């Protein structure tokens, strides 16, 4: 243990005549950790009763199969028993006149015996479990040699208490720490210009144990050595840390010669520690200072320049004392009231989910062990994490974790935009919160407070700026599947997913995205070359768009598979079907930016298939949509009443008198490898009124029949899920447009009679209506996938590519793609945001002069 805070912590004097045991043969090699069941963790309880336990130590005690302890007070014993009833006191292995080394061997062995049985074992040693302790180091070394996982956790040592109670910093001007017997036995060097701490001064040269204490017969040998270096009048601080809450700390000043007084000598016990302050300070080495660039050549150090403040307590008369408020200190204090945090300062800005997760990982050993085995599982199953936070947890990078938790408002704003692009609920909430503050002159502050409550410590203005920046420089804004027209024909589906671009289901190599322009080249092994200019089309310019106009992300530009680049722009891509119903790619898997087909599009008879309780698919009744005025839907002999249609999704409820509930998504399928049956198809869920909604799709239908209903359902579910992503994107876009309008309105709200206010209010009202329309689409989509987790884009398949088909009847005369300016394409913006250089931690560089060389290898508790 770390200190002589109790009478059990005494050194075992070495027997210089002891038999020398040869080292084990070179063939002896430790086994890799963790090959065997069982785990050993040694923790420290600190010196002060209970209060100096670390949170990690307590958690390990609570979760252990077996606990063994040597502690300094009965209150700590009681605390350990309260945390784990399977606890054993190792103090019982001490005995009068029994060699302490025998005791330490036995202490280690009882822990190892339980470890070898496969148990999770925790050893608790008072103070720091690795400082002046033998059993802990012995047990860990043997456990590792035998192939078990074994580690030590630090504790609060007696020296830590001494530094705090006496008020010294070991780095100024350096500190030597010795065990008193070892100092004498090996004639250790003393440096009177540094602090000196001597442990176990009350049992010098003694190797056995005495319950009633020791006769310190060798004490004068220590005083002789100290007097040789420091002189008889140098101060010695007799220190004993307080243990129980009712205890008081002993800090008594004596001189070396006063310690020879028999009355004072009796006050020194086995738990006593000595502190000797510096006798004089070492002068600055001017040559080294010049080499380090800390002093110009030819300059001299002024008298008093090295005077420390706070002063060293009880230092000798040759140690100068500085002053609290000199010129430099007064100048620094004068600047305090005008201080503004610098741009590089990043306070804690993390989601509540991230903060809770990191706290749990730091204080719950079992949770951390589970995370270590599968970081992605925790990252993907924890709700409320932002995308960067999830990535940081998946990688386990200390640098990434720091960067996502200590961020700027601009960084957090980008995280919010990324989150609401994928979470329509968050986007809807933001829309409503913004609109509620339209006429409030303090609206920015109110919205900022709301954002902070959601885990995003940023402002709507920063979010607005982030949205504009991400439209130009981040593919996250455009994440979806796009149907394309190339040279008047249906082109390949282009998918943007998790920062990766796909042509059909082929990954695009070495693409670049900058200033809203996406480029790639066939010279890099791609099946084509392209220069595509992206834009998010909105109607926030104050001019209403024609009915059924496309609103959402699209791109225009150049796409070619061979030869030279086309002379004029030849490509249009949209998140959804084109007005005529033509298109390509995923066969109709669009987004909120298209209005969806009329019910008449889906008139036909569909052979249906349903999932059985055994998990297989079986054919069921025919679903028919009649070509009558009402477009009646029947299922076998049953008529469906009061159904609704939105964005190619039909739904009905048993509460309206239907035999079951259903939500189904329709699409026009073009043959692919995954789904070779052509024509209208649907996929969705059906369930009885008495049953909960199924967790996954369980119903599919198509014109004709299929030998693989499971494959058909899976392919259609993928298309439906990509449509969901498109709908979510539409909600996010409308939320951003509304936020921009509200910011303008808040700025004009100071004068509600002005034309600027009226125009801003009208724009905000219109943006709110547009947002509500997008949210209505999303509500239907939410119903379709009720009880399912939001789609994980890392797992979601890429829709199969379809062959080029002629859609020359598609009317695109109103689409102007001839003036696409791609001359300013910047492909120099190579993304190196994921280069992790933050893992270098230099905040805890230890420049103290602590001498730990040749610590007495037989010194023990």
Curated annotation (Swiss-Prot):
Keyword field: Methylation, Methyltransferase, Repeat, S-adenosyl-L-methionine, Transferase
One Gene Ontology term of the molecular function aspect: methyltransferase activity
Modification after translation (UniProt): AboMA automethylates at Val-805, Val-807, Thr-808, Val-810, Val-812, Thr-813, Val-815, Val-817, Thr-818, Val-820, Val-822, Thr-823, Val-825, Val-827 and Thr-828, Val-830, Val-832 and T-833 before being processed by a prolyloligopeptidase which likely forms a peptidyl ester upon removal of the follower propeptide, which then undergoes macrocyclization with the N-terminus of the modified core peptide.
Transmembrane segments: none
Domain notes: The type III borosins are defined by the overall architecture of AboMA and are distinguished by their additional 400-amino-acid C-terminal domain followed by long and highly repetitive core sequences. Within the homodimer, the clasp domain wraps around the adjacent subunit to position the core peptide into the other subunit's active site for iterative intermolecular methylation.
Family of this protein: In the N-terminal section; belongs to the precorrin methyltransferase family.
This protein's name: Methyltransferase/ribosomally synthesized type III borosin cyclic peptide precursor aboMAa
Upper lineage: Eukaryota, Fungi, Dikarya, Basidiomycota, Agaricomycotina
């Amino acid at each position: 243990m770390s200190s002589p805070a109790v009478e059990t912590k005494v050194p075992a004097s070495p027997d210089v005549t002891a038999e020398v045991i040869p080292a084990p043969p070179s063939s002896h090699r430790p086994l890799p950790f963790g090959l065997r069941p069982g785990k050993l963790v040694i923790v420290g309880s600190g010196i002060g009763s209970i209060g100096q336990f670390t949170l990690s130590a307590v958690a390990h005690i609570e979760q252990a199969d077996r606990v063994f302890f040597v502690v300094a007070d009965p209150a700590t014993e009681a605390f350990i028993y309260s945390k784990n009833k399977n606890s054993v006191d190792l103090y019982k292995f001490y005995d009068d006149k029994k060699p302490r080394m025998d005791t330490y061997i036995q202490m280690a062995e009882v822990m190892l015996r339980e470890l070898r049985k496969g148990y999770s074992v925790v050893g608790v040693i008072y103070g720091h479990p690795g400082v002046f302790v033998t059993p802990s180091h012995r047990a860990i070394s043997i456990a590792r040699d035998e192939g078990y996982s074994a580690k030590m956790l630090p504790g609060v040592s007696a020296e830590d208490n001494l530094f705090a109670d006496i008020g010294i910093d070991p780095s100024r001007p350096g500190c030597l720490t010795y065990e008193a017997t070892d100092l004498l036995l090996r004639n250790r060097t003393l440096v009177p210009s540094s602090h000196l701490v001597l442990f176990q001064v009350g049992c010098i040269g003694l190797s056995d144990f005495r319950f009633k204490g020791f006769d310190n017969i060798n004490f004068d040998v220590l005083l002789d050595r100290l007097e040789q270096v420091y002189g008889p009048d140098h101060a010695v601080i007799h220190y004993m840390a307080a243990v129980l809450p009712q205890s008081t700390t002993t800090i008594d000043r004596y001189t070396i010669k006063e310690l020879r007084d028999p009355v004072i000598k009796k006050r020194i016990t086995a738990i006593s520690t000595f502190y000797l302050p510096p006798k004089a300070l070492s002068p600055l080495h001017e040559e080294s200072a010049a080499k380090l660039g800390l002093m110009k050549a030819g300059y001299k150090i002024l008298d008093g320049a090295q005077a420390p403040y706070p002063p060293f307590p009880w230092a000798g008369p040759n140690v100068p004392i500085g002053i609290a408020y000199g010129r430099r200190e007064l100048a620094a204090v004068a600047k305090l009231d005008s201080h503004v945090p610098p741009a590089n300062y990043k306070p804690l800005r993390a989601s509540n989910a991230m903060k809770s997760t990191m706290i749990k990982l730091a204080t719950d050993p079992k949770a951390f062990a589970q995370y270590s085995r599968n970081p992605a599982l925790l990252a993907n199953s924890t709700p409320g994490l932002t995308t960067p936070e999830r990535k940081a947890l998946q990688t386990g990078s200390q640098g990434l974790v720091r960067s996502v938790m200590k961020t700027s408002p601009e960084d957090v704003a980008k995280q919010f935009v990324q989150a609401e692009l994928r979470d329509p609920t968050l986007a809807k909430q933001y829309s409503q919160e913004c609109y509620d503050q339209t006429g409030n002159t303090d609206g920015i502050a109110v919205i900022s407070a709301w954002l902070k409550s959601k885990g995003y410590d940023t402002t709507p203005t920063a979010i607005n700026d982030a949205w504009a920046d991400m439209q130009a420089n981040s593919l996250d804004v455009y994440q979806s599947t796009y149907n394309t027209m190339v040279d008047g024909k249906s082109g390949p589906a282009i998918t943007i997913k998790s920062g990766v671009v796909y042509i059909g289901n082929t990954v695009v190599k070495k693409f670049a995205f900058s200033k809203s322009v996406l480029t790639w080249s066939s010279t890099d092994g791609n099946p084509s070359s392209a220069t595509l200019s992206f834009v998010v089309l909105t109607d926030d310019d104050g001019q209403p768009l024609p009915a059924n106009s496309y609103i959402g992300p699209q791109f225009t530009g150049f796409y070619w598979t061979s030869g030279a680049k086309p002379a004029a722009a030849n490509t249009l891509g949209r998140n959804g079907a084109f007005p005529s119903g033509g298109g390509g790619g995923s066969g109709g898997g669009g987004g909120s930016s298209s209005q969806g087909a009329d019910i008449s599009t889906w008139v036909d008879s569909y052979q249906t298939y349903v999932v059985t309780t055994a998990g297989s698919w079986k054919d069921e009744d025919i679903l028919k949509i009649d070509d009558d005025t009402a477009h009646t839907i029947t299922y076998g002999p049953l008529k469906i009443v009061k159904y609704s249609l939105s964005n190619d999704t039909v739904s009905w409820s048993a509460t309206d008198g239907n035999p079951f509930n259903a939500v189904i998504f329709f699409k026009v399928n073009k043959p692919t490898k995954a789904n070779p049956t052509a024509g209208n198809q649907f996929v969705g869920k059906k369930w009885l009124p008495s049953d909960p909604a199924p967790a996954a799709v369980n119903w599919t239908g198509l014109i004709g029949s299929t030998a693989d209903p499971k494959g058909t359902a899976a392919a259609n579910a993928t298309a439906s899920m990509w449509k969901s992503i498109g709908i979510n994107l539409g909600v996010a876009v409308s939320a951003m447009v509304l936020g921009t309008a509200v910011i303008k309105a808040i700025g004009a709200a100071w004068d509600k009679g002005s034309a600027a206010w009226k125009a801003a209010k009208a724009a905000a009202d219109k943006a709110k209506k547009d947002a509500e329309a997008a949210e209505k689409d999303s509500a239907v989509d939410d119903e379709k996938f009720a009880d399912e987790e939001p789609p994980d884009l890392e797992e979601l398949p890429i829709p199969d590519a379809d062959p080029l088909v002629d859609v020359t009847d598609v009317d695109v005369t109103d689409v102007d793609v001839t003036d696409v300016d791609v001359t300013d394409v910047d492909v120099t913006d190579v993304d190196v945001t994921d280069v992790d250089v933050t893992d270098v931690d230099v905040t805890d560089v230890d420049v103290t002069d602590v001498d730990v060389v040749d610590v007495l290898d037989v010194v023990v508790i």
